């Protein structure tokens, strides 16, 4: 280990000790050594005893910087690993850091594009428009006579997003340490194996390295834009593919009212009721129609088009984090909500076990009662005031007590849903979430489980059956003929063995074995 690595490790341990994170460690010979270091090597005491553990953990990760902030954000989606209060605190981590030098950004962009910025752009602003842990953005304009540029783009305002320099080395150093810590956890904590810490770090590394290739964000934006092409509900800025690379992407610059600026939205004459309802509609359209949703829809990434305020349209930016759902996920989501609002907790419990996410030996009666105790108080509110996000959160928390491994994509969806609901009620406090969302849930369930869905499934399988039904009579006759031969042989064998009365148990065994083989062979021939 080099001197700089030792120094880096020292700073990380020191930060965790300052916030008393070591207090969460169980009594063990390894952890006793850590507590001894606090007094001898570091001369530190917990300076934040008045704060909750979740808050202390969040502050420590925030102080450690970008890589640790992103780790905390990822861990907040793993509610099978942490109690709700800690997961909620981690979800508050903000991915905001000081910008790096604009001249360095210019050099990075020119290296990626392979030519000076002046080749294609005018008015490049070296002062960053915004800055985060992985990248920052700058503004510019396309030149009027830039080479190989479509005429429609001449003079158009753009945003350039560029990765931070040396981010790869920073990530490698921190990941190496995270893997070491993860490998220790099963040794010092009885529950460590269930938590699978090395797998958690591996999942985090994959997500983080995905973010280091900005072409993924470009691809996400292109797909979302295509999904909502010509939609009055949502607009996604255009990506300019010829200028997009691993470390730089270039996109259309948009101007809109920040969705959090309620005063300006009112001043612009925005239909707030319709705007709030469209937020919910956009979300459920992404989930149930497209199986692909923008998963970072906090207020900083959402704007409202200034044009036609009576028919308001959202503008979404920063598509770096998206969620994908399969039919199994969508069925869980739709059936969970429908069963919950019907107060059918038995169905909720059975569904969790049937999905395979909760152990098969789970006691359904106890599981049902646990859901009832947690969810029933929610109905003290009017139906219109119930939060879908909190319903999901309650379901996850109960399931966690029964060893359910909560799927990350569903927790990502739950967090996004909370954003959307909070935003909707901020825009229009009387928003009825259930009334707005119910048509999407019902339509999807009808499409998947109704008569039309059955007819569609039959049509899809007809070519297979048409091909194989032709041979079915011949296969059946062959199988019956083979069965007759086998039956005759069994009768003969039975008579022979019956004569050997000194080995009755062996006889029974052979007869059973042969009968079993005959049945297996018949099934095999028929298939």
UniProtKB/Swiss-Prot annotation:
Q: List the disulfide bonds.
A: none
Q: Which residues form the Protein kinase domain?
A: 123-527
Keyword entries, A-Z: ATP-binding, Cell inner membrane, Cell membrane, Kinase, Membrane, Nucleotide-binding, Transferase, Transmembrane, Transmembrane helix, Ubiquinone biosynthesis
Give one Pfam family: ABC1
Enzyme class label: transferase
Q: SUPFAM superfamilies recorded for this chain?
A: Protein kinase-like (PK-like) (SSF56112)
Record flagged with keyword Transmembrane helix: yes
Recall the GO molecular function terms of this protein's record.
Answer: ATP binding; protein kinase activity
List the protein's name: Probable protein kinase UbiB
Q: Which organism is it from?
A: Pasteurella multocida (strain Pm70)
């Amino acid at each position: 280990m080099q001197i700089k690595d030792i120094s880096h490790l020292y700073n990380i341990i020191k930060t965790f000790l300052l916030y008393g994170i070591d207090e969460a460690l169980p009594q063990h010979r390894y952890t006793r050594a850590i507590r001894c270091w606090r007094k001898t090597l570091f001369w530190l005491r917990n300076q934040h005893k008045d704060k909750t553990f979740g808050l202390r953990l969040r502050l420590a990760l925030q102080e450690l910087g970008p890589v640790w902030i992103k780790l905390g954000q990822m861990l907040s989606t793993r509610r099978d690993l942490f109690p709700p209060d800690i997961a909620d605190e981690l979800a508050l981590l903000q991915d905001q850091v000081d910008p790096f030098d604009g001249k360095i950004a210019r050099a990075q962009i020119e290296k990626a594009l392979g030519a000076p910025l002046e080749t294609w752009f005018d008015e490049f602003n070296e002062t960053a428009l915004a800055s985060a842990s992985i990248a920052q953005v700058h503004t510019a304009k396309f030149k009027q006579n830039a080479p190989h540029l479509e005429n429609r783009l001449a003079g158009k305002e753009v945003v350039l997003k560029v990765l931070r320099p040396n981010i790869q080395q920073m990530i490698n150093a921190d990941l190496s340490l995270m893997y070491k810590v993860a490998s220790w956890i099963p040794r010092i904590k009885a529950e460590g194996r269930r938590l699978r810490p090395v797998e958690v770090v591996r999942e985090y590394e994959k997500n983080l390295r995905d973010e280091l290739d900005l072409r993924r964000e470009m691809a996400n934006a292109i797909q979302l834009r295509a999904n909502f092409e010509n939609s009055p509900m949502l607009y996604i800025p255009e990506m300019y593919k010829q200028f997009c690379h691993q470390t730089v992407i270039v996109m259309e610059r948009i101007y809109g009212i920040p969705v959090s600026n309620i005063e300006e939205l009112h001043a612009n004459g925005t239909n707030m009721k319709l705007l709030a309802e469209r937020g919910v509609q956009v979300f459920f359209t992404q989930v149930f129609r497209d199986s692909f949703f923008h998963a970072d829809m906090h207020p900083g990434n959402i704007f409202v088009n200034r044009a036609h305020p009576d028919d308001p349209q959202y503008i979404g930016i920063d598509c770096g984090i998206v969620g994908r759902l399969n039919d199994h996920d969508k069925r869980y989501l739709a059936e969970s909500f429908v069963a919950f609002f019907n107060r059918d907790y038995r169905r909720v419990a059975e569904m969790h076990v049937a999905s395979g996410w909760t152990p098969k030996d789970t006691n359904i009666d106890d599981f049902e009662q646990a859901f009832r105790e947690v969810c029933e108080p929610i109905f003290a509110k009017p139906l219109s005031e119930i939060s879908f996000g909190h319903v999901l959160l309650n379901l996850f928390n109960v399931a966690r007590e029964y060893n359910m491994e909560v799927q990350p994509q569903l927790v990502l969806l739950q967090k996004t849903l909370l954003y959307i609901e909070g935003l909707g009620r901020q825009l229009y406090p009387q928003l009825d979430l259930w009334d707005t969302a119910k048509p999407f849930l019902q339509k999807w369930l009808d499409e998947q489980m109704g008569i039309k869905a059955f007819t569609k499934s039959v049509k899809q399988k007809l070519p297979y059956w048409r091909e194989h039904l032709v041979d079915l009579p011949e296969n059946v006759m062959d199988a019956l003929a083979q069965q007759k031969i086998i039956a005759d042989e069994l009768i003969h064998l039975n008579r022979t063995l019956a004569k050997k009365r000194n080995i009755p148990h062996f006889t029974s065994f052979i007869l059973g074995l042969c009968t079993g083989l005959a049945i297996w062979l018949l099934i095999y021939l028929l298939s």
